[in-house]
Amino acid sequence: MSRPIILDCDPGHDDAIALILALAHPELTPLAVTTSAGNQTPDKTLNNALRILTLLNRSDIPVAGGAVKPLSRELMIADNVHGETGLDGPALPAPSFQPQAVNAVELMAEKIRQSDKPVTLVPTGPLTNIALLLASHAELHAKIERIVLMGGAAGVGNWTPAAEFNIFVDPEAADIVFKSGIPITMCGLDVTHQAQIMDEDIERIRAIANPVAKCVAELLDFFMIYHRDPKWGFVGAPLHDPCTIAWLLNPALFDAQDCWVGIETQSELTLGMTVVDRYQLTGKPANATVLFGIDRQGFVDLLVDSLAVYTPTYLNRR
């Protein structure tokens, strides 16, 4: 039985790969793709979502742009990681279709309302759109099965010593989401830094020799550049956002623990920190399933096998 999902993203190399991974599997039914600012400015992330869906010949999936800035803070982007376009590296097609006239929140609300099954939200950028949806449509909470997000860390951050980028960009939005009572799966840096793609994995992808695999290999070639900085201690590049889709497809690839997670919204030193109570020290009930480990080889094999699906016949089936 296929699971209806809405992908809320800020493409971004790893967002694009998460989207490509999701659309290779009939077990997931994408009802919509929505975008926010984050890895690049809102106009660029929206355009990037349209370009990736054009590459995949999926103009049937409605796309809408969302929040242009965080709830109460100034916009921050990660152009040092993702380049001038947000998807530097491959030559992507121009969009073949237009975004919806409604904004991201209203498109999500419409699709959740219309769905005959509870919908899973998959945010892989800042949580602004999701927070706005939850705040403005309380009547739809019961129709959201789960929020599977990329963000946070139980350990150290990657944007500040304490905070991961997506949560740091809009901690107030993250606070709303984690306090919502909706089941959450948190794919934080603890697991995504283990989900590294290596040079030899990129060559496996390139050898698939279809247009989508070629695009992903070229995305990863560029993505590797930032992560080769010795300060990170990486051998490869961490594929953060695809962990959300991989968990939906095969949760057995991951080690997980139910924890209480709180968001720091005030501290000068630890703003945006996800405080993960792994040892039940606070006595507060768990509000998230937090991923801590991954079968890296199984994850890479899933990605490679998924990219092999994108034959010309598959791409032209609609």
Swiss-Prot record:
Keywords on record: Glycosidase, Hydrolase
EC identifiers of the protein: 3.2.-.-
Location of the active site: 240
Bilayer-spanning residue ranges: none
One Gene Ontology term, aspect cellular component: cytosol
Gene3D superfamilies according to UniProt: Ribonucleoside hydrolase-like
InterPro entries linked: I/U_nuclsd_hydro_CS, Inosine/uridine_hydrolase_dom, IUNH, Pyrim_hydro_RihA, Ribo_hydro-like
The keyword Hydrolase belongs to this UniProt entry's keyword annotation: yes
GO molecular function, one term: purine nucleosidase activity
EC top class, as a word: hydrolase
GO BP of this protein: nucleobase-containing small molecule interconversion; purine nucleoside catabolic process; pyrimidine nucleobase metabolic process
Any Pfam family hit: IU_nuc_hydro
PROSITE patterns in UniProt: IUNH (PS01247)
Task of the protein: Hydrolyzes cytidine or uridine to ribose and cytosine or uracil, respectively.
Family, per entry: Belongs to the IUNH family. RihA subfamily.
UniProt cross-references to HAMAP family, sorted A to Z: Pyrim_hydro_RihA
Name this polypeptide is given: Pyrimidine-specific ribonucleoside hydrolase RihA
Organism in which the protein naturally occurs: Shewanella sp. (strain ANA-3)
